[in-house]
């Protein structure tokens, strides 16, 4: 859940020692993880915090989504595709679906992703307190998937010092308010270690594991140890994975609502 505070100078604060994967491969992976975001960003349709019809009250569903690196503020291209497809799911017909864009830099400075962990965690806690009947869908793409994954963590990994603003994992009782978690192109632990050896592994917590869909295109070098196609990292909307995740999330939202009704 937490990102270590220990960093080096401005230039290696994100990348660390790239020699472990070779200069040529490092260049191509950087291009996949970051430069590719520029074309994905062109798909963005909604600014952060854009109000919906249910903005003054409590929506039936709220999507809390963290965009990928270099994408402008909002939910990003992959996030918008996921939201659009979620809203078309038949199980959610007639339901008010709001969107909250996680507020964080989404920059080359990976330790600053802690800002996103704090913001997303605070949003989930706030919604759970103010709107206990709202079903939340937590998600993220690329660096944003790391943010969302850290939010679900059960504990602070041994040896990691949490940055200011993070005191520990979310309380267990919050988990029942999060119906689904959707991750796209989540950085693998091997990728994290190759670019920032201070970053803790991304482990989805036990309370969230069964309601998490972790989408990784096999050729995506960011999430797949055997991936080698840089373009695959930005193909989640085109290859059907956002649609698949939307169907999964809608089913989980519906199931959570049924459980809540039965328990009353």
What do these predicted ranges mean?
Residues 57-135, 215-242, 246, 251-260:
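Active-site catalytic motif of lipid deacylating hydrolases and related acyltransferases
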Residues 84-91, 195-211, 215-217:
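Active-site-adjacent alpha-helix of alpha/beta-hydrolase-fold enzymes
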Residues 1-55:
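Secretory targeting and sorting signals
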Residues 1, 193-194, 224-228:
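Short conserved micro-motifs at the rims of enzyme active sites and ligand-binding pockets
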Residues 117-207:
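Serine-dependent carboxylesterase/thioesterase catalytic core
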């Amino acid at each position: 859940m937490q990102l270590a505070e220990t960093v080096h100078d401005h230039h290696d604060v994100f990348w660390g020692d790239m020699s472990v994967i070779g200069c040529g491969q490092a260049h191509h992976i950087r291009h996949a993880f970051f430069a590719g975001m520029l074309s994905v960003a062109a798909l963005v349709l909604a600014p952060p915090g854009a109000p919906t019809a249910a903005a003054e009250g409590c929506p039936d569903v709220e999507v809390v989504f963290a965009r990928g690196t270099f994408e402008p503020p909002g939910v990003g291209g992959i996030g918008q595709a996921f939201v659009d497809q979620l809203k078309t799911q038949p199980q959610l017909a007639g339901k008010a679906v709001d969107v909250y864009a996680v507020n964080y830099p989404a920059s080359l400075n990976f330790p600053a992703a802690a800002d996103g962990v704090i913001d997303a965690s605070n949003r989930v806690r706030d919604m759970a307190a103010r709107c206990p009947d709202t079903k939340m869908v937590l998600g993220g793409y690329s660096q944003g998937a790391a943010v969302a994954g850290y939010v679900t963590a059960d504990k602070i990994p041994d040896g990691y010092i949490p940055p200011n603003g993070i005191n520990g994992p979310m309380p267990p009782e919050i988990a029942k308010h999060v119906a689904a978690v959707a991750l796209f192109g989540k950085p693998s632990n091997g990728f994290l270690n190759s670019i920032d050896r201070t970053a803790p592994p991304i482990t989805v917590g036990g309370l969230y594991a069964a309601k998490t869909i972790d989408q990784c295109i096999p050729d995506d070098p960011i999430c797949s140890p055997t991936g080698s196609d840089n373009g695959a990292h930005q193909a989640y909307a085109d290859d059907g994975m956002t649609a698949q995740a939307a169907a999964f999330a809608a089913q989980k939202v519906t199931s959570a609502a049924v459980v809540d009704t039965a328990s009353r």
